[in-house]
């Protein structure tokens, strides 16, 4: 194996952070649905996610010019959001294991996310074109909600609940804008097409975070979020039939974490229904189906990345 390919950070695609986010989230999903197995594999998936994220972090910390250049691009820049989101999700796990380690990482990741969001939208608005808008643009303003998961464990309940409400409001504002772009501003480029899968990520992340941070959730808002979440999840499943036919590119990693987040949100929703509407418990089976699909997607994309770094593995001797 040519291990130099893995340590040449300048060539690491930023979308590798999307796979890292999918790995970390998958550990949480398994821990929710099958705690016996989840407790065993979650630390390993979190570790693999951290290892996937590390080269991306090193790429940008060692070359600030590349960081700014990628952040200016409407596709690459938006797909850099999972870098900080992965750290925030990792802190959700670490907060229960080692709060002393988790807190400084959480605070640094929160500052990183806010900084990247400010720079990204400043660059995009200075050269704004409606055709540049992508589903991945949701990730900065709505993805910030992922900081509320560890924030609640650190005792910042007011911060977390306020952030959840704010991010949900931003989502409802951005949704018609993104849909307008997808309908009336032409087809997405081949590189940007995998971002269609991200349509399911912000709403499911909002639903999961809302149910975690509010002990007495509003049934109307919960129903609205759940309805859109299920619709968007089914939409991206239809998209998979086309996206999985595309030639493998690193940006295809964007299909992993939305499906993972959808399974987590469905578990939170069925947990809520168990208490208030037990006749909806059958949705738990749908959530388990989502977990199965997301696990398969993470494995498939992981194999693609392995072949990308070590192409000789796929060659016949």
Tell where the protein language model's regions lie, with residue ranges.
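Hydrophobic, membrane-facing alpha-helical anchors
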Residues: 1-6, 51-66, 109-125, 145, ...
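Juxtamembrane helix-loop boundaries in multi-pass membrane proteins
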Residues: 2-27, 64-89, 106, 122-149, ...
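Helix-coil boundary and interhelical linker segments in multi-pass alpha-helical membrane proteins
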Residues: 28-40, 92-103, 149-161, 210-221, ...
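Membrane helical hairpin/interfacial module
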Residues: 35-101
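Structural signature of hydrophobic alpha-helical transmembrane segments
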Residues: 40-54, 99-114, 158-173, 219-231, ...
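A generic transmembrane alpha-helix motif of multi-pass inner-membrane proteins
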Residues: 58, 267-307
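Generic multipass alpha-helical transmembrane bundles of integral membrane proteins
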Residues: 108, 137-238
């Amino acid at each position: 194996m040519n291990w130099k390919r893995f340590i040449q950070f300048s060539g690491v695609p930023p979308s590798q952070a999307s796979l890292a986010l999918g790995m970390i989230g998958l550990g949480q999903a398994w821990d929710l649905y099958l705690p016996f197995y989840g407790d065993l594999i979650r630390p390993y998936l979190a570790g693999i996610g951290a290892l996937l994220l590390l080269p991306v972090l090193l790429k940008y910390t060692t070359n600030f010019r590349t960081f700014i250049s990628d952040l200016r691009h409407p596709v690459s820049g938006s797909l850099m959001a999972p870098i900080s989101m992965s750290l925030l999700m990792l802190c959700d796990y670490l907060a229960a294991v080692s709060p002393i380690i988790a807190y400084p990482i959480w605070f640094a990741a929160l500052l990183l996310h806010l900084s990247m969001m400010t720079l990204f939208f400043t660059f995009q608005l200075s050269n704004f074109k409606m055709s540049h808008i992508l589903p991945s643009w949701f990730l900065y303003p709505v993805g910030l909600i992922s900081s509320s998961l560890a924030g609640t464990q650190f005792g910042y309940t007011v911060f977390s609940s306020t952030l959840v409400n704010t991010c949900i409001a931003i989502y409802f504002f951005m949704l018609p804008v993104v849909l307008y772009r997808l309908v009336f501003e032409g087809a997405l480029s081949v590189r940007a097409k995998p971002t269609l899968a991200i349509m399911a990520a912000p709403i499911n992340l909002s639903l999961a975070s809302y149910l975690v941070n509010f002990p007495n959730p509003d049934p109307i808002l919960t129903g609205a979020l759940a309805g859109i979440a299920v619709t968007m999840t089914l939409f991206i499943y239809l998209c998979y039939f086309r996206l999985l036919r595309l030639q493998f590119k690193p940006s295809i990693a964007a299909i992993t974490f939305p499906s993972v987040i959808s399974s987590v949100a469905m578990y939170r929703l069925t947990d809520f229904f168990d208490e208030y509407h037990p006749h909806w418990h059958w949705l738990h089976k749908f959530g388990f189906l989502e977990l199965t699909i997301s696990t398969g997607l993470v494995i498939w994309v992981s194999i693609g990345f392995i072949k990308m770094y070590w192409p000789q593995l796929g060659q016949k001797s």
